[in-house]
Amino acid sequence: GLPYAFASHFAPRMLHQALAIYRQMFKPSAALAKPYAIVGGPVIAAETDEQADYLASSTHQRVLGILTGNRTRLLPPVENFWQQLDARSQAAIADFLAAGVIGGPDTVQLGLQKLADETQADEFMIVSDVYDADLRLRSLEITADAMKA
C-alpha cells in the first residue's frame, strides 16, 4: 500500500517487470488506495539533438566505466565520442540507457511521452548527468518544459 520507485537508470531491462509485479501485488492501505509508480531514469536535454548527443558523451563515458570496472567521476563531454566506440561498447551503453531520453526539446517530449505511455508512470524522477552545472540545470529546465507540454 505504498508508492514504488524504480531506478531504471540502473536496471532498465527490469523496469516493466518490476512495475507489473508492484501493480499485481499492490494492496490498498490507509496511505494509498491505488498503486503509484515512480520511474527514475536518465534524461539529457539540450537546445538541439546534436548538442544533447555531445553532452551525453559524459554519461556514455560514465556508463562505459561502470561496465568495464573503471569508475571515475563524471568526465567532460568529448566530441564524436559515440563514433569512436566499437559496436559492442555502443550496444552495451545503449542497453544500459534503454529507458533514457537524449535530445532537444521535441525529442525529449516525445521520448518521455513514450516512456509514460509504456509504463503508465505517475511520476518521473530524472537524473541528468551533464558535466557543466549550468548546462545540467538547463537540461532539467528543458525536461520540465517538455513534461508540461
Give a label for each model feature:
Residues 5, 98, 133:
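Active-site oxyanion-binding pockets that recognize sulfate/phosphate
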Residues 1-16:
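Loop-centered beta-sheet repeat module
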Residues 17-25, 133-149:
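C-terminal helical cap(s) of enzyme catalytic domains, especially alpha/beta-barrels
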Residues 119-129:
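Short helix/strand-capping connector loops at secondary-structure junctions
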Residues 9-10, 127-135:
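Glycine-rich, proline-tolerant flexible connector loops at the mouths of alpha/beta enzymes
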Residues 13-121:
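An alpha-helical appendage that flanks or caps ligand/catalytic pockets
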Residues 3-5, 36-38, 123-125:
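Structural preference for beta-strand elements that scaffold enzyme active sites
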